[in-house]
């Protein structure tokens, strides 16, 4: 093959592909990027056994079609050092030659036929995403998922598809908290009325880098494939049964408080400078924040005024993990939030008020959280 390509287009695509390379074993075909020139397009692939990405860029000129491979890390290292002008890529015998002006680099290739095939699936479920609400849900739920969880089912995000009602539930948990949302009015095509899959967190994070809107999602139960005009991404799914999260959601709450999000974030941040756990006290006209630290004598306290006042007869105390509480608040797209509680020792819920409008492009996330024992 022999082509000329834009330096910027090539470099941007190579950066996307880095996450899919085996950088520990340079002798592995998985350390290489597969190149294929067809007419005026250069297709680039990187893959290991669990995850992969195929992208393309347009060539500036194509003198000869063909295939080749090149060490992905070294390829990016070279391209990123070159000037912002076109680059010539040419295969010669068992090497790939990179040229720009008076600079030339020659790197060995592997047998392109040994590169793993990009999977083609017969989907059991598929949907077209024309707005960023799914990516928004992934972004907001990602912090809740532990990638190294000893329970492999919890090392990913649960996606529950319901074809009858055209809804998609997205759920993540680390056993200390659980975040979930239900996306509605989406176009789901499925071979079954109810079907679910568990997407690994690693895959979720790569999807956030590559896709925003106008893409498709397909799954056959073992693999998931996500595609748009320039990228095709695949991942193995986590094989296992996700816990029935509906069973742990309280049926009702004895108390419900509507509170200012930014004021609470400020109070929690101030107290969390000394401790990761905080005692929250709600009174009729005030919210009090106090750091909890049993090992040292250090303390931090602050309070915020509740303008509208709470319908509360006596003070309500709650122990919270500062980091978890802040992440739950950051997932909300409203200026206020609702805190729903039962006993101080029972799980509590953080969600958006039903009567406050937010962008229809945002996912409405609810987070159930275990309290800290006071």
Curated annotation (Swiss-Prot):
Q: Please, which domain of life does this record's source organism belong to?
A: Bacteria
Per UniProt, which keywords does this protein have?
A: Cytoplasm, DNA replication, DNA-binding, DNA-directed DNA polymerase, Nucleotidyltransferase, Transferase
Subcellular location per the Swiss-Prot or TrEMBL entry: Cytoplasm
Query: Does the UniProt entry include the keyword Nuclease?
Result: no
Q: What are the record's GO terms for cellular component?
A: cytoplasm; DNA polymerase III complex
Transferase: is it a keyword of this entry?
A: yes
Q: Which SUPFAM superfamilies match?
A: DNA clamp
Summarize the protein's role. Confers DNA tethering and processivity to DNA polymerases and other proteins. Acts as a clamp, forming a ring around DNA (a reaction catalyzed by the clamp-loading complex) which diffuses in an ATP-independent manner freely and bidirectionally along dsDNA. Initially characterized for its ability to contact the catalytic subunit of DNA polymerase III (Pol III), a complex, multichain enzyme responsible for most of the replicative synthesis in bacteria; Pol III exhibits 3'-5' exonuclease proofreading activity.
Fetch the NCBIfam families from UniProt: dnan (TIGR00663)
Could you tell me what this protein is called? Beta sliding clamp
To which species is this protein native?
A: Helicobacter pylori (strain J99 / ATCC 700824) (Campylobacter pylori J99)
């Amino acid at each position: 093959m022999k082509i000329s390509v834009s330096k910027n287009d090539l470099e941007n695509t190579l950066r996307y592909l880095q996450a899919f390379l085996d950088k520990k074993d340079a002798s592995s075909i998985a350390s290489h990027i597969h190149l294929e020139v067809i007419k005026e397009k250069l297709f680039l692939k990187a893959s290991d056994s669990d995850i992969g990405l195929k992208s393309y860029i347009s060539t500036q000129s194509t003198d000869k079609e063909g295939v080749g491979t090149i060490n992905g890390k070294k390829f990016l290292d070279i391209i990123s050092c070159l000037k912002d002008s076109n680059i010539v890529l040419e295969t010669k015998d068992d090497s790939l030659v990179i040229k720009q002006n008076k600079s030339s680099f020659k790197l060995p290739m592997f047998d392109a036929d040994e590169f793993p095939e990009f999977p083609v699936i017969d989907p059991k479920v598929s949907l077209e995403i024309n707005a960023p609400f799914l990516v928004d849900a992934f972004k907001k739920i990602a912090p809740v998922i532990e990638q190294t969880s000893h329970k492999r089912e919890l090392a990913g995000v649960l996606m529950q598809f319901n074809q009858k009602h055209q809804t998609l539930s997205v759920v993540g948990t680390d056993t200390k908290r659980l975040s979930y949302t239900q996306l509605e009015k989406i176009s789901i095509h499925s071979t079954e009325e109810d079907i679910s899959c568990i997407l690994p967190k690693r895959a979720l994070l790569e999807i956030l880098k590559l896709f925003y809107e106008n893409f498709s999602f397909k799954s056959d139960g073992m693999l998931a494939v996500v595609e748009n005009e320039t990228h095709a991404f695949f991942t193995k799914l986590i094989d296992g049964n996700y816990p029935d999260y509906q069973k742990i959601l309280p049926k009702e709450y004895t108390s419900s408080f509507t509170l200012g999000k930014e004021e609470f974030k400020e109070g929690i941040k101030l107290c969390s400078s000394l401790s990761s756990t905080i005692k929250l006290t709600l009174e009729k006209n005030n919210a009090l924040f106090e750091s909890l630290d049993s090992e040292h004598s250090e303390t931090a306290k602050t309070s915020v005024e509740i303008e509208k006042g709470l319908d509360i007869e006596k003070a309500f105390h709650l122990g919270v993990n500062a980091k978890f509480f802040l992440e739950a608040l950051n997932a909300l797209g409203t200026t206020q939030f609702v805190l729903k509680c039962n006993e101080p020792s029972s799980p509590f819920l953080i969600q958006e008020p039903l009567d406050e409008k937010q962008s229809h492009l945002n996912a409405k996330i609810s987070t159930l959280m275990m309290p800290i024992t006071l």
